[in-house]
């Protein structure tokens, strides 16, 4: 993760920092983030990084958003200390973050998904592998024995065909 205000603001706006989801403000969804980024770009503020340090009334005035939305954005952007602790734990475990504006972000995701591409990715390992042709398999972790055999057969075929297998939530 590059240490820029733009990246930091993106991570603050999108991250769920507590396990029990009991936060003062709910992080932005992907769709909300894209809309909000466009609002910011169309304003005099220009970029998400320039929002850091703004108070609620400045957010309202500069972006033309309702007080409730300004409060939510303000609350999300002011979790810097908490986020620093969370990021430190991630980095210790070899987990990193890349955001859509960074050079390392997989271009294929943007090409294929457009504004449905996740603005932020958590990853471990070599992110450059995501530039290769591949197949993502997620959620295959809690299956019966027959399902596991089926998935193993599928995985074997994927690998023999020369595709990179990207997993998430699988065993």
Q: Which role does the model predict for each range below?
A:
Residues 1-149, 153:
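Short, positively charged patches
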Residues 156-159, 163:
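Glycine-rich phosphate-binding loops that contact phosphosugars or nucleotide phosphates
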Residues 166-169:
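Structural motif
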């Amino acid at each position: 993760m590059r240490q820029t205000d733009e990246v930091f603001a993106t991570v603050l706006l999108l991250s769920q920092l507590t396990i029990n989801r009991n936060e003062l403000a709910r992080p932005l969804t992907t769709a909300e983030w894209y809309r909000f980024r466009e609002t910011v770009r169309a304003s005099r503020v220009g970029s998400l990084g320039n929002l850091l340090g703004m108070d609620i009334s400045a957010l309202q005035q500069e972006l033309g958003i309702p007080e409730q939305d300004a409060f939510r954005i303000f609350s999300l952007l002011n979790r810097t200390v908490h986020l620093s602790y969370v990021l430190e734990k991630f980095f210790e475990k070899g987990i990193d973050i890349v955001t859509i504006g960074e050079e390392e972000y997989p271009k294929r995701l943007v090409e294929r998904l457009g504004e449905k591409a996740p603005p932020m990715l958590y990853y471990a390992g070599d992110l450059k592998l995501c530039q290769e042709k591949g197949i993502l398999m997620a959620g295959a972790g809690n299956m019966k024995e027959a399902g596991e055999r089926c998935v193993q057969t599928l995985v074997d075929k994927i690998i023999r065909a020369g595709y990179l297998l990207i997993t998430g939530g699988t065993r």
